[in-house]
Curated annotation (Swiss-Prot):
The keyword Electron transport does not apply. This is Threonine--tRNA ligase. GO terms for molecular function: ATP binding; catalytic activity, acting on a protein; metal ion binding; threonine-tRNA ligase activity; transferase activity; tRNA binding. PROSITE patterns: AA_TRNA_LIGASE_II, TGS. Its cofactor is Zn(2+). It is found in: Cytoplasm. Keywords: Aminoacyl-tRNA synthetase, ATP-binding, Cytoplasm, Ligase, Metal-binding, Nucleotide-binding, Protein biosynthesis, RNA-binding, tRNA-binding, Zinc. SUPFAM superfamilies: Class II aaRS ABD-related, Class II aaRS and biotin synthetases, TGS-like, ThrRS/AlaRS common domain. Zn(2+) binds at residues 333, 384, 509. The gene is thrS. The keyword Transferase does not apply. Residues 1-61 form the TGS domain. Gene3D superfamilies: 3.10.20.30, 3.30.54.20, Anticodon-binding domain, Bira Bifunctional Protein, Domain 2, Threonyl-trna Synthetase, Chain A, domain 2. Residues 242-532 are annotated as: Catalytic.
Amino acid sequence: MFEVKLKDGSAKEFDGEISLLDVCKSISEGLARDCVGAVVDGKIMGLMETIDSDCEVQFVKFDDDEGKQVFWHTSSHLMAYAIQRLYPGTKFAIGPSIDSGFYYDLDTDHKFVPEDLEKIEAEMKKIVKENPKLVRVEISRKEALERFKNEGQDYKVDLIENFDEDATITLYEMGDFVDLCRGPHLLDVKNIKAFKLLSIAGAYWRGDENNKMLQRIYGISFPKKKLLDEYLDRMEEAKKRDHRKIGKEMGLFSIQEEGPGFPFFHPNGMVVLNELEKFLKEQLLERGYGQIKTPLILNEHLWHQSGHWDHYKENMYFTKIDGEDYAIKPMNCPGSILVYKDELHSYRELPIKVAELGQVHRHELSGALHGLFRVRTFVQDDAHVFCLPEQIEEEVSKTIDFCDYIYSKFGFKYEVELSTRPEDSMGSDEDWDLAISSLKNALEHKGLPYKINEGDGAFYGPKIDFHLEDAIGRTWQCGTIQLDFQMPERFDMTYIASDGSKKRPAMIHRAILGSEERFMGILIEHYAGKFPLWLSPVQVEILPISDKFNDYAYELQQKMKARGLRVKVDDRSEKIGLKIRESQLKKVNYSLIIGQNEIDNNEVSVRKRDIGDVGSKNTDEFINELVDEYQNRK
C-alpha cells in the first residue's frame, strides 16, 4: 500500500504498481481525457508510466508548460515517423520539444524545400487517423547499440555510446518508427489535431561546427485548430514587427558581413540607446548606486580565479599581450570585485552598490546569431551589491522594486522564475540552501508569484529571472537577480565587522535590461517601431505646405531644438498629402503642418501618430506640452 498526494492536498492509496493513467481515471474520467502527462515529485512523466511508492503527483494539461513539453515532444516523433515513411534511409539525430513547438535534426540526401513541408504534414495527418499507440520499451545498452547499428542510425549510436555500460536504455515505438528517447510522451497521437511545419534550417550535430551540418525542421502543434490559427496570426504579426526589418527601415542598426554578430548602430539607433542609458543612469543615482567602468581585456589568471575558465571558457575570446594570455571579458562581475577590493571597507559602509553599463563579448556559433537578439558583443546593464548577510533580503526586495519600475515604464507585464542549483556548480550545500531560501523569502514577502526552474541557476548561485510579456503575448527573459556566496570566497573579499574581525560580504549580481542591444530589439518589436516620444529618434516632423513656408519651418525647428526636442523639416516640393503619408510611414510621433494661416495665428496644425488630425494648437503651448511629455517619459 502506498500514498499518492495530489495538488489539491488530498491523497489516494493504492495496493501495488499502477499506471499514472489509472491514477488519473480514479480521480475523474474527464480529467483523464484532458490530461497529457503528470509531474511526479518534480519530474515530468507520461501517463503510460507507472508508480509504486509514496509520491506527490500533479496531472498536467496542454495549457500547462509541462503539458506542452509532452505534447510537442510526441509531435516531434509524429513528424519523424512521417519523414521515415516518405524518405526512407533518413538518419535521425535529436527531436526535442522547445519553448514554442518542436524540431527534428535529420541527415538525408534529400534537400528539403518548403514544398516538402506540406507533403510531410499530409503524411502526419494520415498517421493521426491511424492513431498508433506509443509504447515505452526498456532494453540494455548492448541491445540498443546492436539495434541502431543494424538500422544505420549513426547518431543514435553516437548518443548511446556515451551511456554507462550497465545503463538501461529507453525507446519509444510509434508504429514502425522507433526512437531512442527518455520521453515522456502522449499515450497516442489522436489529440494532435492541428499542426504546422514552420521552417527548415541547418544545425551542426551536437552544436559543433566541426561536425556534419544536418537539416532541421521546426513545427508547432495544438489540440485544437483554433489554437493553431491564433498562433499563426501571432506569427504573422511578429513578422511585421521583425526588429531587423524595422531597424533597417528606420535607420536604427545594421549587421555587416565584416562583423557577423557585432551590430553597427546608426544615428537613429544611438538616440534610442542613449535615451535608455540616460533613464537607467538617473535611476541608478536616485537608488544609491555608484557607476564604474572596467577594462574590456583582463589577464587570464583573473578568469581562472573567478571560475569562468572552468565553466565558461568555450564562450570566451582570447588574446596575448606582452607574451601573456588575456581574455576579453564575457561578464562584468570580476571587474566589479577588483574595484571593491581596491579599498578597505567597514560594515558601516554596507551595502555598497556599484553599476556598470559594461560591454562584454561572448562567442556564439554563426548559426545562432539573430539580429540584436543573439549577438557576440553587447552592453550589459550590470550592478553588484555587496552587503551583510542580514541585508540580503532587503536588497533583493529593493532590486525587485527597481525592476518593476523599469518594466512598467515600457508597459511590460512579467512573470518571475526562481532557478536553483545546476549540476555544474560551485560551493557547498549549505551555501546553496541559504542562497535559495533568501531569494524565496524576498519573493514571498513581496507577494510575487513565482515558478521554480530546477537546475537552471548560474554556476555560482541561484537566481531570480524576469520574463516580460510583449504587446503580442510573447515572453522574453530579461532581468536577473543572482545571489553569490562563491565569488567573495574565491577573491578573499572582506569587510571589517563591528568586532574588528574580517568577514565575507554577500554579493548580489543584477541586470534589469540584460543586454541593451537585445532589449532594444524587444522594444522595436513591442512597439512595432512606434516608440513613445522620449525614445523616438524623430519626435516631430514639420511639413510646410509649400516652399515659401520653408524658412518659417526651419525657424520653428530651431525653437523646438532649443527645448531639447528632436525635429526634422520636410522641405521637398511635394504635395502636402504625400508628405503626411510619408511622415506616418516613418512612425514620427507628431507631424506639424505649416501654412500662412498657422503663421498668422502663431499656431501649428497637429497630426498625432495613429490618431490623425487633432486640430490647431498655439505653438508655444504645444511645445510646452511636448517638453512635458518628453521629460516625464509619458
